[in-house]
């Protein structure tokens, strides 16, 4: 799957994020800024969403950057566990269908 990218300047305006804050977030490895062949700064849609979550946590919930980092990692872990659970459940359903002779996908 190909990642979609947004212009960094537009994301910064939308989220009211300044260059200093963005640099801090990038230095912590929470988001990654890339550059096009025309040297335009872009950010992936996923990283733009991560940046939005960070700004909400920090502005509205008074969480510091280190706390936001922990929350993002926990959020990623929960998402990974959910995907694993879904895969296990799918495999279990397929096995049950196979054993009882039901239709499979």
Predicted regions and their residues:
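Arg/Lys-rich, alpha-helical DNA-contact motif
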Residues: 2-9, 13, 23, 27-28, ...
């Amino acid at each position: 799957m190909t990642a979609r990218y947004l212009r960094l300047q537009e994301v910064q305006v939308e989220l009211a994020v300044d260059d200093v804050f963005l640099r801090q977030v990038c230095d912590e490895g929470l988001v990654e800024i890339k550059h096009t062949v025309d040297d335009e700064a872009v950010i992936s849609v996923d990283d733009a969403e991560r940046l939005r979550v960070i700004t909400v946590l920090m502005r509205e919930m008074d969480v510091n950057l280190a706390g936001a980092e922990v929350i993002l990692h926990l959020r990623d872990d929960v998402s990974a566990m959910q995907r694993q659970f879904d895969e296990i459940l799918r495999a279990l359903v397929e096995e049950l269908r196979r054993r009882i002779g039901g239709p499979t996908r």
